[in-house]
């Protein structure tokens, strides 16, 4: 305690020479106190049993004050002033945050000490107290600077107190040394305790998530027995396909700017908007029957609800190649064909040289065209030798959307050296303009065209040296 008094005197200023210094408190030579500059935390020894007089320096003047009223320590560890009449006054907490108090034991002599300005206040207690261990406070995460006189002081040994058995969580261990700030009663966990608690929390969360996943994955046996193949028959699959079709149809109409039709009706928008060709022909009944999406008569024919198509500027402006020269006279598209057919009123605007000849029409009327039928052609070229060769049109298996790709072949052609061909008599009006002019008997063949044209009546593609 002597070292602490000297340090206080040196820090606060010089003491008046006329004033007698108080002697050392009893029983404190073996229990030193360590004082830091911030005056926030301190070490204290056991309190004595004898009454202690209280001396306090309230200001920095050199005047001497009389002993103050005694104090006592309540259950919370706070020191409360005891009034003179002995009655219990309202509790007055002497420990105030921000004020430098240093609690010391009672001196042996009753001399008073006058403190200079800037010195810490020394408070002595007169209330008799039972010997008890004072709390030990440490500066958290910061070591207090020690004075030179304190370097060789031995630490104080606190009396052993049996710890109370308290229920704690599994895996959490409490250290014997509790570190806490002065204004807090809850000890801070050490690094070992913190790591133990974090590890237990992680293990608990992993097990909780695992059990939740298992609960969702497990299905009762009763629900599994209800899942059979009967729930997914053809009717349900077809209904799912129809719903999928209506959803995509509504999305397409919405992207194109048209109003989305109602999805109440399960039929497509063009249902029964055209006549069934099989039923209208009257040859045989329609194989589809009631499932046919085309109208079987005018009673079933209804107006279309589908939005109108954008107009085609080239609609019905060119002759269909199936009805041109060398055509089969049959169009697989029928009424859906966008080219001119002989039954259309636009057929009058087609030049005669582009139309099918009358001989082709008369001959092809008796021929029922099929997908793989070889369409016969009228013999155009006659040999002077007497035997006629018949160029035939061979339809390929791979057809395009415009019609069958056909090539000409001269089957059984037996040409002799020096033979010539004679063209049958024909009207010049039926010829195209580039063939109406007078041509030489033997035109040069050095500039023969070898393009893959679809004009099946072109003599240049045949490789013949004749002319019309």
Swiss-Prot record:
Modified residues (Phosphoserine): 458
Any one GO molecular-function label of the UniProt entry: DNA binding
Role played: Functions with mex-6 to affect embryonic viability, establish soma germline asymmetry in embryos and establish plk-1, pie-1, mex-1, and pos-1 asymmetry in embryos. Also affects formation of intestinal cells. Binds to mRNA in vitro, and inhibits pgl-3-mediated P-granule formation, probably by competing with pgl-3 for binding to mRNA. Required for neg-1 expression in anterior blastomeres during embryogenesis.
One record GO biological process: regulation of protein localization
Superkingdom of the source species: Eukaryota
Organism annotation: Caenorhabditis elegans
Region span, Disordered: 1-32, 243-269, 414-468
Compositional bias per record (Basic and acidic residues), positions renumbered to this chain: 243-254
The protein's name in its UniProt record: Zinc finger protein mex-5
Zinc finger (C3H1-type): 270-299, 314-344
Species lineage: Eukaryota, Metazoa, Ecdysozoa, Nematoda, Chromadorea
Positions of post-translational Phosphothreonine modification: 186
């Amino acid at each position: 305690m002597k070292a602490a008094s000297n340090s206080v005197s040196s820090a606060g200023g010089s003491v008046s020479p006329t004033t007698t210094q108080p002697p050392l408190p009893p029983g404190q030579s073996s229990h030193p106190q360590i004082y830091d500059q911030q005056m926030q935390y301190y070490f204290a020894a056991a309190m004595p049993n004898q009454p202690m007089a209280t001396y306090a320096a309230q200001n920095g003047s050199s005047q001497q004050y009389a002993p103050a009223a005694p104090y006592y320590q309540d259950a919370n560890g706070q020191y409360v002033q005891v009034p003179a009449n002995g009655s219990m006054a309202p509790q007055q907490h002497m420990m105030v945050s921000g004020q430098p108090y240093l609690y010391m034991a009672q001196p042996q002599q009753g001399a008073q000490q006058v403190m200079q300005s800037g010195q810490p206040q020394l408070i002595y207690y007169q209330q008799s107290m039972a010997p008890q261990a004072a709390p030990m406070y440490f500066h958290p995460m910061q070591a207090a600077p020690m004075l030179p006189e304190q370097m060789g002081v031995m630490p104080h040994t606190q009396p052993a107190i049996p710890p109370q058995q308290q229920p704690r969580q599994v895996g959490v261990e409490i250290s014997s040394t509790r570190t806490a700030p002065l204004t807090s009663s809850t000890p801070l966990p050490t690094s070992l305790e913190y790591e133990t608690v974090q590890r237990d929390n992680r293990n608990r969360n992993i097990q909780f998530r695992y059990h939740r996943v298992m609960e969702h994955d497990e299905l009762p046996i009763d629900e599994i027995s209800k899942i059979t193949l009967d729930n997914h028959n053809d009717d349900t699959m077809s209904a799912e396909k129809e719903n999928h079709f209506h959803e995509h149809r509504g999305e397409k109409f919405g992207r194109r700017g048209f109003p989305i039709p109602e999805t109440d009706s399960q039929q497509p928008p063009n249902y029964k908007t055209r006549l069934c060709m099989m039923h209208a022909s009257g040859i045989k009944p329609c194989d589809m029957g009631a499932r046919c999406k085309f109208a079987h008569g005018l009673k079933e024919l209804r107006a279309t609800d589908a939005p109108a198509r954008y107009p085609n500027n080239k609609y019905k402006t060119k002759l269909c190649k199936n009805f041109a020269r060398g055509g089969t006279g049959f169009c697989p598209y029928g009424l859906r064909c966008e080219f001119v057919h002989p039954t259309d009123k636009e057929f009058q605007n087609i030049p005669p040289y582009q139309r099918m000849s009358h001989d082709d029409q008369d001959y092809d009327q008796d021929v029922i065209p099929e997908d793989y039928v070889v369409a016969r052609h009228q013999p155009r070229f006659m040999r002077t030798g007497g035997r006629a060769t018949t160029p035939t049109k061979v339809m390929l298996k791979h057809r395009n959307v415009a019609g069958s790709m056909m090539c000409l072949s001269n089957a059984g052609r037996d040409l002799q050296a020096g033979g010539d061909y004679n063209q049958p008599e024909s009207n010049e009006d039926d010829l195209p303009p580039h063939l109406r002019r007078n041509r030489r008997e033997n035109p040069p063949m050095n500039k023969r065209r070898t393009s893959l044209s679809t004009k099946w009546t072109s003599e240049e593609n045949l490789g013949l040296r004749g002319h019309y």
